[in-house]
């Protein structure tokens, strides 16, 4: 099955609005946090081509603790993007603390979530090709990108967040490793902006 868009870490769908609007193919949105899921479902309820998967994607099928900013703390922290901070590492969330973002441990919720590997996701939805894969998972991008069998699935473009690749607000050898991996599968690598990378498959 072909998907025009697969988004891992879809949040409420707000930042995907433009991508969703220009799609004519099937869309798969993945999001593990309940209050984000509720908004995501509401925001996309009239689009029949969208399927929403309630889980996290990592390198294996498992159930594990997931940390995110409490819904009740988002307005207190006065940053709209706080609802998008979710991670398998509590430290990653606390490391966002700054003068203007006074997050504390009491602002963090923990929940056991179901995780699928990318391979299991592909098998579940019988995915053979993806026009655009977007990954925004607060530092878990490395495990996902490393686990993909690029020879068995056609992915035209991958957009992924780079700013937390090796640690919170740190880019290092893991990012270099993934860039080299994508280059080995004949992808062109470019900075989309200061936080994200675009990898485009070259079929020539």
Model-based region annotation:
Residues 1-204:
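Phosphate/nucleotide-binding beta-alpha loop and adjacent structural elements of enzyme active sites
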């Amino acid at each position: 099955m072909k998907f025009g868009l697969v988004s891992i870490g879809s949040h409420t769908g707000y930042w995907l609005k433009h991508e969703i609007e220009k799609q004519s193919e099937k869309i798969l949105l993945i999001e593990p946090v309940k209050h984000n899921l509720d908004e995501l479902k509401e925001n996309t309820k009239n689009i029949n081509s969208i399927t929403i998967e309630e889980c996290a994607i990592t390198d294996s099928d498992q159930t594990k603790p997931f940390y995110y900013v409490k819904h009740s703390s988002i307005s207190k922290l006065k940053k709209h993007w706080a609802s998008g901070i979710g991670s398998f590492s509590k430290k990653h969330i606390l490391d966002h603390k700054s003068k203007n973002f006074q997050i504390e441990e009491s602002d963090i919720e923990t929940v056991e979530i179901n995780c699928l590997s990318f391979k299991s996701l592909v098998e579940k939805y019988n995915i053979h090709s993806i026009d655009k894969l977007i990954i925004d998972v607060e530092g878990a991008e490395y495990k996902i990108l490393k686990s993909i069998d690029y020879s068995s699935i056609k992915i035209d473009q991958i957009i992924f967040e780079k700013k937390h690749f090796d640690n919170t607000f740190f880019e290092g050898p893991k990012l270099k490793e993934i860039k080299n991996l994508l280059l080995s599968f004949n992808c062109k690598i470019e900075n989309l902006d200061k936080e994200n990378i675009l990898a485009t498959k070259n079929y020539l």
